[in-house]
A protein has these predicted regions:
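Transmembrane alpha-helix interface/packing and boundary motifs in multi-pass membrane proteins
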Residues: 86-95, 245-267
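Membrane-interface alpha-helices at helix entry/exit sites of multi-pass transporters
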Residues: 77-80, 98-100, 110-123, 280-291
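Membrane-embedded alpha-helical segments of transport systems
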Residues: 86-94, 115-140, 253, 287-303
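Predominantly cytoplasmic-facing regulatory/coupling regions of multi-pass membrane proteins
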Residues: 1-85, 142-254, 277-282, 286-290, ...
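Short intracellular "coupling" helices and adjacent cytoplasmic loop segments at the cytosolic face
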Residues: 71-74, 85-101, 105-108, 260
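Interfacial segments of multi-pass membrane proteins
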Residues: 106-114, 246, 268-284
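Hydrophobic alpha-helical membrane segments of integral membrane proteins
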Residues: 101-105, 118-121, 131-132, 212, ...
């Protein structure tokens, strides 16, 4: 996909983001939302952005770990960081393009074939979802109405892991794929995709990266907690418990519905749950949602667009890197 098409999709998402703002403002009364934004203690915003940044840094650590797991070597750390953070700039694009932009840039900068790196976004989303389930587990016991979303994630994740780790079944499917006339030419890429999936979803990577996701997304829960404090909500363990349920529940719901960047679904979830569990007014809940979504979503988009601009300059100043053979850089799957 060309950068022009990416810009077009991003523009669509910016329009959707503006519509979400208008929708929340209409729901809560525009003048009340403006007043609420004025009353927010903006000195807390750097803490919100700092906590979100820690989440991004830990997720970059996960990206680096996964690159090593599938056997990527010799990729400079600076280029790897630019590649990862550039993906943040496209998380709000339709079709989840941002999830795969990293793999495309990895191919352009390093020559790693897409079939080798494509399982990384899958593993990232799986471990992120499992981490969110762990974060929301305590709150789920207390506020059990949202348990269906959590069950779907756990069951779906378990099915994906079992499918990837069941080598006889996978090999049977690959053999059948080779016999199909229209798709047989992709058999080699499918095998490379499976080899990476097998390595990434092994017990140690799966467990370690899920634990890392608990910590990284925990920083976003803390960011929401700080936003609530900035709105005048009394802090404490009870508020932190409720925040640790609201953010994971809203994030998981938006992930399951596959909306770009969770637009609309996440905002609706955070606003509604804040009213129900925290007793906030419509306007305060809407203001809190707008601020935390700026800090945890749109801030990342801004960082990502800067990184994408730097990557574009980097690519413009060098010769194309030949794509490596898919089987030549494989991970150990023994």
């Amino acid at each position: 996909m060309t950068l022009d098409k990416l810009r077009g999709r991003l523009l669509i998402s910016l329009v959707l983001g503006a519509l979400v703002f208008v929708g929340l403002s209409a729901y809560a009364d525009f003048s009340d939302v403006i007043d609420g934004l004025g009353q927010f203690r903006w000195q807390y915003l750097p803490a919100v952005l700092g906590l979100t940044s820690l989440n991004y840094v830990l997720r970059f650590v996960k990206w680096e770990y996964y690159l090593r797991t599938i056997g990527v070597r010799g990729f400079p750390r600076r280029e790897s960081a630019l590649t990862y953070f550039a993906g943040l700039g496209m998380v709000v694009t339709p079709g989840k393009v941002g999830e795969w932009l990293k793999c495309f840039l990895l191919r352009e900068l390093h020559g790693t074939p897409l079939s080798r790196s494509a399982p990384i976004p899958v593993a990232e989303r799986l471990t992120d979802s499992l981490g969110l389930v762990v974060l929301g587990a305590v709150g789920l016991i207390v506020f059990g109405d949202a348990w269906p979303a959590f069950v779907v994630v756990v069951v779906g994740g378990a099915f994906l892991v079992l499918l990837a780790r069941h080598r006889p079944l996978a090999h049977w499917l690959l053999v059948r794929l080779e016999r199909l006339p229209l798709v047989s030419r992709f058999a080699k890429q499918a095998e490379a995709f499976y080899d990476s999936s097998y390595a990434l979803l092994a017990p140690v990577p799966l467990g370690a990266m899920t634990l890392l996701s608990v910590v990284s997304w925990g920083f976003e829960v803390l960011a929401f907690y700080v936003v609530l404090i900035g709105l005048g909500v009394d802090g404490g363990a009870d508020l932190l418990l409720k925040a640790s349920f609201i953010m994971p529940a809203a994030t998981l719901a938006s992930a399951l519905l596959l909306t770009p960047g969770g637009l609309g679904v996440a905002e609706g979830g955070i606003t509604g749950l804040s009213q129900v569990l925290l007793g906030m007014s419509k306007s305060d809940a809407a203001v809190g949602t707008l601020i935390v979504r700026f800090g945890t979503l749109w801030f990342g988009v801004i960082v990502g667009l800067v990184a994408l601009a730097l990557v574009s300059r980097l690519l413009a100043g060098r010769q194309p890197v030949p794509v490596r053979e898919a089987a030549g850089e494989g991970a150990s799957v023994s």
